[in-house]
């Protein structure tokens, strides 16, 4: 009985607190738990201690989840397999995809790739092109594709998410980043199947993102490769296997990576192929051999080449619009790629690549690289190089598309087709072979394909392809693969030596690019099959180069072999025109490798280009083994070997740079690039880029790319990269070499690659990126990818036409070397620029001087106005570089602003360099010449507050005027909050300086937009003469978290002063609390601001400013009509609401609140004179005041004595308006204001707004308040105490028992700020009373009045029927409101509560 009593009494209390009317039912034996559940279900959930009847998520807990037949509503809630509610909102496809993604994650990198591929695959499906289905297959390969596939649809919708999530899951951070990218890509995937294919690529790239992911991506690509051919796929599958292994470990990756590399190349290719596969259709063509395609392409490759490209192009055509958009997207998407964006772009790339088919392939490559990029920035760097390669390829591929007919040729190439494959190399090979054969112009196209060979990176897949080309080629590929795998291993290196990776990535690029180059080597092999093998060896060596330069050396001998291929290149040289094309052709795959070689091959085309290319050779160096070989061959096969040595290691390269010198004057040029190349080594990836350069136009791009890669590697690299920028000059040449078309394509390539580098800048650059310069701009995009890259990228920006101008600023002496005199002067500027912005400035003058050249070249910049845009970007980039990557954050802005400034380009270059501020309206040098010239500086920064989600943007605009003593500075603060409200604060500081002093006037203009209504407040801030004085100008609300976790606000005073320099200084003065005891014994806390000032005699003056917390709630009880006498004596009727409130003494007070006036009154007053006859008959003149009042059409005139005229204009209320008002707790309420119209001295109307009181709707509890109810029950066995906490937050009352909420209700009463304890004691058999301060105690059974500390009328009239066992202490309004439960049962609460207790004890 004791337990039962305790239990029931406690529940009686609970029910009483809840205000339940079911006490009788409970006390007389009804199901108590059901009754409680019915009453409290709206407040109770299982996790808050609900009854045992609500478990398992059945319809008793969540009736909204079941229809009237009890069937689950799957669209409303989430159910498990037993139709139990998991949570009362729909299961999200993303969650299931996440589950699949978890599966993916378990599958790990493969899954990841697959999931991406899934996306792609479904999308693949979408793109029939998908033939991709191979990809799907591949995705299957990648993952247990089946699951992925099944999930893939979801994945597709969520696939971006899934891809990302799964990838994210598997490769964690990298993947996550990549996953977002994947998401981007998947969206893009959504954008197009091709995108899908690219997304698979992206996925692939995501895999790459994994890093092994790259392998994984390769595995995706493997998917592609499966498309390539069963055997390719076999490789692919190996890749797949390896890729997981790769995921497992990079070493395996190495081994597998070789396959993977092949496959990854394929991946690249395949992804590119995939892209092409979207192109697949190309791919399909690829499928046809997909990679085999490569081979097939070799055989069918014509199809593949041509058709893939062609098909892809047709598909491209279909996709091409997408592609086109995507291609711009490719640029932009690449940009989008940024990284994720890269991924996205990669998808788009896919699309775009598809558009190009191969270009998109390039894109895919980019995608691939981007995924790698996703995988890791270093890899990204590397991947970006690869991407660059691929992007070159993209260019090429697009060109390939153009060349695709050539591709047809290439199919002819088909033998080289496989070269094609490698070219994608294949295309270049093809182009090379057949294109070249067909026509050097085609060769030019093919040089694009050389870009393709960049694709060779992809082509490395193509290398796989090339293996397809021939088993031995494949062997080469394998070698390449090997190197690439090493690269993969180095990819860790890449990560660690991402510069290497960059290099290696170059090598990755290398290998991939090397792969590319290898592919290209393959291409080279294509140049000669054995050569290719050599090339592959080179590839191997190049990765080995990554591994060790000595191998590079050895490989360089191989390179020599390849140099024989180089010889081919040389031969290409013979066909130098073709070299341009043909060199690209030449090994154009090599050219790819060469391409880096290409440059050299192209270089071969023209030694000057070679020189330029030699930079690229440096770049090639990176390709070093092969590309350099190419380069070397071009330089000289052995020289290039030297170059390779350089490639072998940047330090060696440095050493070798001397070799480079020896390598030949060209090499010398390259040697500067060698310097570059040493940097290149760091930037070697850039070298990779160079290889992209290889596609010479790409070379341009790639140079840029190179620059960017190098830039990525290091700013010094940037310098070196600028040499590549030089390459970009070469680009000029190379573009010349290739053919401007290639250049165009290469630009795209650049853009893609750069896109790879970094989408954001790429984005900006992307538009330009398509421009050849843009490519470089793309490089800058890469710069965007990473701030270091950005720095480099700025050089890239330089690289872009910018290369000429900015790159000159930014670029670097290397460029100068390569650039030649233009670059030199500018390069000095640029190198110095690199060294320091000031130098850049000075140099910028030089740059300007060079800009004459720059100008000339800048004309180039301008001529390549895309480049100019680039140069703008350069500017922006440089500003970014100079300012720091900060600005790069908003690379888009930069691009735009930069582009804006780009018109200024040359001066802006210096300006930017001189100052990161975006606006160099004039070159700083020209400003001093005009004393009265005005320079406006505008800087912008955005700060996002993590805690409350508001982002605040500060824009500072300063306009100093020389030779004038007045300066105006304006700072605009824009705060955007999650509730869609926007607050703009404008601080205007006017400093007027005379000969001796400066006076500052400050005014803050605060504008708040709430729900479409605008409130403007002018807050003048007085000038504080004494610095020691603290004057609280205004108060502010500071959010504070109490120790118990409650969030409240504290009022602080803001003291605003001006220091000796005339700058505004604000200081926060916390307001102290003063405790005071009220008459009823309650202690209140009053916040007051303590203001300390210094008096006239130096004494300290302390002033306390009390701050009232309390808000009264006013309700209009009724409306009446009141007569009102105006200042002019006229009496009018107004409508007013009568508000009845209770003051602190408990007395009722009435107060009228004006509502709406019935008429509009206009008035004026003036003086008049008229004659007056005095009593003595004399006539004089008297002056009187006349007040004229107009009401509607009526006019009233009143004459008063002059002394009775109002001293100020009469104020007449025109109307009452309700305006929004934001309370300190961020609640938005309304405020009633009167609009007053006054007449000034000139009888002009003046409008004034004044608040007229509190609106009837306003209720604002100052703080979250909570009270404690201590409930004690006693019986023979002793006493037990229960504590119930009542928390009041806003107008929500939450009652908790033992920490769990049992009642939550809304109250319309204003809840005052206080905290009280209420004690209840119940003793059986006798009466006990607990005295508490301020309480009224009565032991008689008569009614006990409950008196509250506040005298609230809600409680005054109520009474408690007290049994002999109950005593009620003082109850505050908030506590009483809680105890009374909801409004429906408040009147009967006390009765139920007492009766319930009595009955409970009777039953007990």
UniProtKB/Swiss-Prot annotation:
<feature type="repeat" description="1-6">
    <location>
        <begin position="196"/>
        <end position="201"/>
    </location>
</feature>
<feature type="repeat" description="1-41">
    <location>
        <begin position="444"/>
        <end position="449"/>
    </location>
</feature>
<feature type="repeat" description="1-76">
    <location>
        <begin position="693"/>
        <end position="698"/>
    </location>
</feature>
<feature type="repeat" description="1-37">
    <location>
        <begin position="413"/>
        <end position="418"/>
    </location>
</feature>
<feature type="repeat" description="1-84">
    <location>
        <begin position="749"/>
        <end position="754"/>
    </location>
</feature>
<feature type="repeat" description="1-10">
    <location>
        <begin position="222"/>
        <end position="227"/>
    </location>
</feature>
<feature type="repeat" description="1-43">
    <location>
        <begin position="457"/>
        <end position="462"/>
    </location>
</feature>
<feature type="repeat" description="1-70">
    <location>
        <begin position="654"/>
        <end position="659"/>
    </location>
</feature>
<feature type="repeat" description="1-21">
    <location>
        <begin position="298"/>
        <end position="303"/>
    </location>
</feature>
<feature type="repeat" description="1-48">
    <location>
        <begin position="494"/>
        <end position="500"/>
    </location>
</feature>
<dbReference type="GO" id="GO:0098552">
    <property type="term" value="C:side of membrane"/>
</dbReference>
<feature type="repeat" description="1-60">
    <location>
        <begin position="579"/>
        <end position="584"/>
    </location>
</feature>
<keyword id="KW-1003">Cell membrane</keyword>
<feature type="repeat" description="1-9">
    <location>
        <begin position="216"/>
        <end position="221"/>
    </location>
</feature>
<feature type="repeat" description="1-4">
    <location>
        <begin position="162"/>
        <end position="167"/>
    </location>
</feature>
<feature type="repeat" description="1-2">
    <location>
        <begin position="136"/>
        <end position="141"/>
    </location>
</feature>
<feature type="repeat" description="1-19">
    <location>
        <begin position="286"/>
        <end position="291"/>
    </location>
</feature>
<feature type="repeat" description="1-54">
    <location>
        <begin position="533"/>
        <end position="538"/>
    </location>
</feature>
<feature type="repeat" description="1-75">
    <location>
        <begin position="687"/>
        <end position="692"/>
    </location>
</feature>
<feature type="glycosylation site" description="N-linked (GlcNAc...) asparagine">
    <location>
        <position position="817"/>
    </location>
</feature>
<feature type="repeat" description="1-61">
    <location>
        <begin position="585"/>
        <end position="590"/>
    </location>
</feature>
<feature type="repeat" description="1-13">
    <location>
        <begin position="247"/>
        <end position="252"/>
    </location>
</feature>
<feature type="repeat" description="1-72">
    <location>
        <begin position="668"/>
        <end position="673"/>
    </location>
</feature>
<feature type="repeat" description="1-14">
    <location>
        <begin position="253"/>
        <end position="258"/>
    </location>
</feature>
<feature type="repeat" description="1-31">
    <location>
        <begin position="374"/>
        <end position="379"/>
    </location>
</feature>
<feature type="repeat" description="1-42">
    <location>
        <begin position="450"/>
        <end position="455"/>
    </location>
</feature>
<feature type="glycosylation site" description="N-linked (GlcNAc...) asparagine">
    <location>
        <position position="1074"/>
    </location>
</feature>
<feature type="repeat" description="1-1">
    <location>
        <begin position="104"/>
        <end position="109"/>
    </location>
</feature>
<feature type="repeat" description="1-27">
    <location>
        <begin position="343"/>
        <end position="348"/>
    </location>
</feature>
<feature type="repeat" description="1-73">
    <location>
        <begin position="674"/>
        <end position="679"/>
    </location>
</feature>
<feature type="glycosylation site" description="N-linked (GlcNAc...) asparagine">
    <location>
        <position position="994"/>
    </location>
</feature>
<keyword id="KW-0677">Repeat</keyword>
<feature type="repeat" description="1-80">
    <location>
        <begin position="725"/>
        <end position="730"/>
    </location>
</feature>
<feature type="repeat" description="1-39">
    <location>
        <begin position="425"/>
        <end position="430"/>
    </location>
</feature>
<feature type="repeat" description="1-79">
    <location>
        <begin position="719"/>
        <end position="724"/>
    </location>
</feature>
<feature type="repeat" description="1-55">
    <location>
        <begin position="546"/>
        <end position="551"/>
    </location>
</feature>
<feature type="repeat" description="1-82">
    <location>
        <begin position="737"/>
        <end position="742"/>
    </location>
</feature>
<feature type="repeat" description="1-30">
    <location>
        <begin position="361"/>
        <end position="366"/>
    </location>
</feature>
<feature type="region of interest" description="88 X 6 AA approximate tandem repeats">
    <location>
        <begin position="104"/>
        <end position="541"/>
    </location>
</feature>
<feature type="repeat" description="1-49">
    <location>
        <begin position="502"/>
        <end position="507"/>
    </location>
</feature>
<feature type="repeat" description="1-66">
    <location>
        <begin position="623"/>
        <end position="628"/>
    </location>
</feature>
<feature type="repeat" description="1-26">
    <location>
        <begin position="336"/>
        <end position="341"/>
    </location>
</feature>
């Amino acid at each position: 009985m004791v337990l039962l009593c305790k239990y029931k009494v406690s529940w009686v209390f609970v029910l009483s607190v809840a205000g339940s009317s079911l006490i009788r039912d409970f006390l007389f034996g009804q199901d108590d738990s059901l009754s409680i559940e019915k009453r409290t279900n709206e407040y109770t959930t299982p996790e808050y201690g609900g009854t045992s009847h609500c478990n398992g998520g059945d319809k008793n807990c969540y009736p909204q989840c079941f229809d009237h037949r009890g069937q689950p509503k799957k669209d409303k809630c989430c159910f498990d397999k037993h139709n139990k509610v998991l949570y009362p909102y729909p299961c999200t496809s993303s969650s299931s995809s996440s589950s699949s993604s978890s599966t993916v994650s378990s599958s790990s990198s493969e899954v990841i790739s697959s999931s991406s591929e899934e996306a792609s695959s479904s999308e693949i499906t979408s793109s029939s092109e998908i033939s991709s289905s191979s990809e799907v297959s591949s995705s299957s390969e990648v993952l247990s594709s089946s699951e992925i596939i099944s999930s893939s649809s979801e994945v597709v919708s969520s696939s971006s998410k899934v891809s990302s999530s799964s990838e994210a899951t598997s490769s964690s951070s990298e993947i996550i980043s990549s996953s977002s990218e994947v998401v981007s890509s998947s969206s893009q995937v959504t954008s197009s199947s091709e995108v899908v294919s690219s997304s698979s690529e992206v996925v692939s790239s995501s895999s790459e993102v994994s890093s092994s992911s790259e392998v994984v991506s390769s595995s995706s690509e493997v998917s592609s490769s499966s498309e390539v051919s069963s055997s390719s796929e076999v490789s692919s599958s190996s890749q797949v296997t390896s890729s997981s292994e790769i995921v497992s470990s990079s070493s395996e990756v190495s081994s597998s990576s070789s396959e993977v590399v092949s496959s990854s190349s394929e991946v690249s290719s395949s992804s590119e192929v995939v892209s092409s596969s979207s192109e697949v259709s190309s791919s399909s063509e690829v499928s046809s051999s997909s990679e085999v395609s490569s081979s097939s392409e070799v055989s069918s490759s014509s199809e593949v080449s041509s058709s893939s490209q062609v098909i892809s192009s047709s598909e491209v055509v279909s996709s091409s619009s997408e592609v086109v958009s995507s291609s711009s997207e490719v640029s932009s998407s690449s940009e989008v790629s940024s990284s994720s964006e890269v991924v996205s772009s990669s998808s788009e790339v896919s699309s775009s690549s598809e558009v190009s088919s191969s270009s998109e392939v390039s894109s895919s490559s980019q995608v691939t690289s981007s995924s790698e990029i996703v995988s890791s920035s270093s890899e990204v760097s590397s991947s970006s190089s690869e991407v660059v390669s691929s992007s070159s390829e993209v260019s090429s591929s697009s060109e390939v598309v153009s060349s695709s007919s050539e591709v047809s040729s290439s199919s002819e190439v088909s033998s080289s087709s496989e070269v094609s494959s490698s070219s994608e190399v294949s295309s270049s090979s093809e182009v090379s072979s057949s294109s070249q054969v067909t026509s050097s112009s085609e060769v030019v196209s093919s040089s694009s394909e050389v870009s393709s060979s960049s694709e060779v990176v992809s082509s490395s897949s193509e290398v796989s392809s090339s293996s397809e080309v021939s088993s031995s080629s494949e062997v080469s590929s394998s070698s390449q693969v090997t190197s690439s795998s090493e690269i993969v291993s180095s990819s860790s290196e890449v990560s660690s030596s991402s510069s290497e990776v960059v290099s290696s990535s170059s090598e990755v690029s290398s290998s991939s690019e090397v792969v590319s180059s290898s592919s290209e080597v393959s291409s080279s092999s294509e140049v000669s099959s054995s050569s290719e093998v050599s090339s592959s060896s080179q590839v191997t060596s190049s990765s080995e180069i990554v591994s060790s330069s000595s191998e590079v050396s050895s490989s360089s001998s191989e390179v020599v072999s390849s140099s024989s291929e180089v010889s081919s290149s040389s031969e290409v040289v013979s066909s130098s025109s073709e070299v341009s094309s043909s060199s690209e052709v030449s090994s154009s795959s090599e050219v790819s490798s060469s391409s880096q070689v290409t440059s050299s091959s192209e270089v071969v085309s023209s030694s000057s280009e070679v020189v330029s290319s030699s930079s690229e050779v440096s770049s090639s160096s990176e390709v070093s083994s092969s590309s350099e070989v190419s380069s070397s061959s071009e330089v000289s096969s052995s020289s290039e070997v030297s170059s390779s040595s350089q490639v072998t290691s940047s330090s060696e390269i440095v050493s070798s740079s001397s070799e480079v010198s020896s390598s030949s004057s060209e090499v010398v040029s390259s040697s500067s690039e060698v310097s570059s190349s040493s940097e290149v080594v760091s930037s070697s990836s850039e070298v990779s880029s160079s290889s992209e350069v290889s596609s010479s136009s790409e070379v341009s791009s790639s140079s840029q790319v190179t620059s960017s890669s190098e830039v990525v590697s290091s700013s010094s690299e940037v310098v070196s990269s600028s040499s590549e920028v030089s390459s970009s000059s070469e680009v000029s040449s190379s573009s010349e070499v290739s053919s401007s078309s290639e250049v165009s394509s290469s630009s795209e390539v650049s853009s893609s690659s750069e896109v790879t580098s970094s989408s954001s800048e790429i984005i900006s650059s992307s538009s330009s990126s398509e421009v050849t310069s843009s490519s470089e701009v793309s490089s800058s995009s890469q710069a965007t990818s990473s701030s270091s890259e950005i720095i480099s990228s700025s050089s890239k920006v330089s690289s872009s036409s910018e290369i000429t101008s900015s790159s000159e600023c930014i670029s670097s002496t290397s460029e100068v070397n390569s650039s030649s005199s233009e670059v030199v002067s500018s390069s000095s500027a640029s190198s110095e620029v690199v060294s320091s912005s000031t130098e850049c400035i000075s140099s910028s003058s030089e740059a300007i001087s060079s800009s004459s050249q720059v100008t000339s070249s800048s004309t180039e910049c301008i001529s390549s106005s895309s480049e100019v845009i680039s140069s703008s970007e350069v500017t922006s980039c440089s500003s970014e570089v100079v300012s720091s990557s900060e600005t790069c954050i908003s690379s888009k802005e930069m691009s735009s602003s930069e582009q804006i400034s780009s018109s200024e380009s040359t001066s802006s270059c210096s300006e930017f360099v001189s100052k990161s501020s975006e606006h160099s309206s004039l070159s700083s040098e020209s400003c001093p010449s005009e004393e009265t010239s005005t320079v406006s500086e505008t800087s912008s920064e955005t700060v996002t507050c993590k805690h409350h989600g508001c982002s605040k943007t500060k824009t500072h605009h300063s306009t100093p005027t020389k030779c004038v003593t007045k300066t105006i500075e304006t700072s605009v603060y824009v705060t955007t909050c999650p509730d869609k409200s926007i607050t703009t604060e404008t601080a205007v500081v006017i400093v007027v300086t005379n000969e001796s002093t400066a006076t500052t006037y400050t005014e803050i203009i605060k504008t708040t937009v709430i729900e479409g209504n605008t409130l403007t407040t002018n807050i003048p801030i007085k000038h504080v003469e004494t610095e020691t004085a603290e004057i609280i100008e205004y108060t502010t609300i500071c959010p504070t978290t109490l120790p118990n976790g409650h969030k409240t606000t504290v009022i602080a005073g803001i003291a605003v002063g001006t220091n000796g320099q005339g700058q505004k200084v604000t200081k926060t003065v916390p307001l102290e609390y003063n405790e005071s005891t009220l008459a009823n014994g309650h202690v209140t806390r009053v916040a007051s601001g303590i203001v300390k000032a210094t008096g006239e005699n130096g004494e300290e003056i302390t002033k306390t400013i009390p701050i009232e917390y309390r808000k009264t709630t006013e309700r209009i009880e009724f409306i009446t009509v009141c007569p009102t006498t105006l200042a002019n004596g006229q009496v009018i009727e107004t409508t007013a609401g009568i508000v009845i409130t209770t003051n602190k003494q408990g007395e009722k007070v009435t107060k009228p609140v004006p509502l709406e006036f019935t008429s509009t009154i206009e008035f004026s007053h003036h003086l008049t004179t008229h004659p007056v006859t005095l009593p003595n008959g004399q006539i004089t003149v008297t002056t009187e005041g006349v007040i004229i009042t107009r009401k509607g059409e009526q006019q009233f005139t009143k004459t008063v004595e002059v002394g009775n005229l109002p001293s100020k204009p009469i104020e007449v209320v025109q109307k009452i308006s309700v305006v929004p008002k934001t309370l300190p707790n961020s609640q938005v309420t309304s405020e009633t204001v009167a609009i007053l119209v006054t007449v000034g001295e000139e009888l002009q109307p003046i409008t004034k707004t004044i608040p007229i009181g509190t609106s009837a709707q306003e209720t604002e509890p100052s703080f979250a308040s909570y009270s404690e109810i201590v409930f004690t029950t006693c019986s023979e066995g002793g006493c037990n105490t229960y504590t119930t906490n009542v928390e009041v937050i806003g107008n929500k009352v939450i009652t908790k028992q033992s920490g769990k909420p049992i009642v939550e209700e809304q109250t319309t009463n204003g809840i005052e700020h206080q905290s009280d304890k209420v004690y209840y004691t119940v003793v059986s058999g006798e009466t006990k009373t607990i005295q508490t301060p301020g309480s009224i105690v009565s032991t008689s059974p008569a009614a006990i009045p409950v008196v509250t500390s506040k005298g609230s009328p809600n409680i005054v009239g109520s009474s408690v029927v007290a049994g002999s066992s109950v005593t009620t202490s003082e109850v505050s309004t908030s506590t009483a409101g809680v105890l009374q439960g909801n409004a429906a049962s408040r009147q009967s609460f006390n009765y139920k509560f007492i009766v319930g207790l009595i009955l409970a004890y009777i039953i007990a």
